[in-house]
């Protein structure tokens, strides 16, 4: 498996994202750019220029609209094909996370806790037929701590928020209030990642663990311990595998013993919890991992501004996990 290296960004990658068909790859970075690439050959199509560090992006189901959240306190809507900015909305502080609801009728935006402002989750109605695409709907109550990411639950009935205090908070979108708090991590929760159809979700944390939950019962199913901060997870839609990435943060690398192997992305079996292998490709912490919807390709983005696109070999799909964990009985 030979990765395609995408080199354009001069600062750390914040998010890598495939569209619904998996043929386009969007890359957000701290150099105020979002770049667009073809997945198959790594050819660059173009880029979208924002006014500040781009923290989060999402793309609509039909791949027509791109939304960005950036440090210049703006959420923007872009036309994917022309690169034109269609709409934007201003906040008092940086926009940290952004996501389309299922069906693309609404957008949530998370704003930072800074300069006396409380972290908030803002929900906007998204109307693609109107000139003004974003119309404010409501704001959820603040958790009184920084929110790293927010994401829509199944059928948009809930919103899940990962927080700085190690909690995952769940809000009801109908009642617009906090209904549940999960307190299983003892450090900042960096990301929430869904399985296909949102039956289960995984939380990543700076405490070195990733935890898998049942969405309906919120029961903890499995804990994956890597012994180092986890920034991102990619759950395969095709096989029972999860890829975890992270590593010591840039500021603590100089004060602790560090080697390149801790920045490799690691494959785990989602059912048995055992490590299957790893892949070295970055020389700094991995910040984002994303699978294509068909599960045949995944991309990773790192601290050094490099994006690696890995097209998985046929041998990966022919590998039968059951032969490893349930070997045939010898008579």
UniProtKB/Swiss-Prot annotation:
One of its GO terms (biological process) is formation of cytoplasmic translation initiation complex. GO terms for cellular component: eukaryotic 43S preinitiation complex; eukaryotic 48S preinitiation complex; eukaryotic translation initiation factor 3 complex; eukaryotic translation initiation factor 3 complex, eIF3m; phagocytic vesicle. WD repeats lie at residues 8-47, 49-88, 142-181, 184-223, 281-320. Its main location: cytoplasm. Transmembrane segments: none annotated. It holds the Pfam family EIF3I. PROSITE patterns: WD_REPEATS_1, WD_REPEATS_2, WD_REPEATS_REGION. The keyword Repeat applies. SMART domains: WD40. It is found in: Cytoplasm. Keywords: Cytoplasm, Initiation factor, Protein biosynthesis, Repeat, WD repeat. It comes from the Eukaryota. GO terms for molecular function: RNA binding; translation initiation factor activity. Component of the eukaryotic translation initiation factor 3 (eIF-3) complex, which is involved in protein synthesis of a specialized repertoire of mRNAs and, together with other initiation factors, stimulates binding of mRNA and methionyl-tRNAi to the 40S ribosome. The eIF-3 complex specifically targets and initiates translation of a subset of mRNAs involved in cell proliferation. Belongs to the eIF-3 subunit I family. Component of the eukaryotic translation initiation factor 3 (eIF-3) complex. This is Eukaryotic translation initiation factor 3 subunit I. It comes from Dictyostelium discoideum. The lineage of its organism: Eukaryota, Amoebozoa, Evosea, Eumycetozoa, Dictyostelia.
């Amino acid at each position: 498996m030979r990765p395609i290296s995408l080199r354009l960004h001069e600062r750390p990658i914040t998010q890598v994202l495939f569209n619904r068909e998996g043929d386009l790859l969007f890359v957000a970075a701290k150099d105020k750019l979002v770049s667009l690439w073809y997945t198959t050959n790594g050819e660059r199509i173009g880029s979208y220029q924002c006014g500040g560090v781009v923290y989060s992006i999402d793309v609509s189901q039909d791949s027509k609209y791109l939304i960005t959240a950036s440090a210049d306190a703006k959420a923007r809507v872009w036309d994917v094909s022309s690169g034109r900015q269609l709409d934007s909305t201003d906040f008092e502080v940086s926009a940290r996370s952004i996501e389309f609801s299922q069906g693309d009728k609404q957008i949530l935006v998370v704003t930072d806790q800074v300069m006396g402002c409380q972290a908030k989750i803002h929900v906007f109605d998204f109307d693609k037929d109107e000139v003004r695409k974003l119309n404010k709907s409501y704001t959820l109550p603040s958790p009184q701590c920084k929110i790293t990411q927010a994401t829509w639950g199944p059928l948009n009935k809930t919103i899940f928020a990962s927080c700085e205090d190690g909690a995952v908070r769940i809000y009801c979108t109908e009642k617009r209030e906090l209904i549940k708090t999960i307190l299983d991590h003892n450090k900042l929760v960096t990301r929430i990642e869904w399985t296909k159809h949102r039956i289960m979700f995984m939380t990543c944390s700076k405490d070195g663990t990733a935890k898998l939950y049942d969405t309906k019962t919120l029961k903890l199913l499995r804990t994956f311990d890597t012994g180092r901060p986890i920034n991102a997870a990619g759950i395969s839609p095709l096989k029972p595998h999860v890829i975890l990435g992270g590593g010591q943060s840039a500021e603590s690398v100089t004060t602790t013993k560090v080697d390149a192997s801790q920045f490799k992305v690691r494959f785990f079996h989602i059912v048995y919890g055992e490590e299957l292998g790893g892949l070295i490709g970055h020389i700094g912490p991995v910040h984002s991992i994303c699978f294509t919807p068909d599960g045949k390709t995944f991309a990773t983005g790192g601290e050094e501004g490099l994006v690696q696109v890995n097209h998985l070999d046929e041998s990966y799909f022919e590998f039968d996990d059951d032969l490893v964990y349930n070997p045939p009985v010898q008579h």
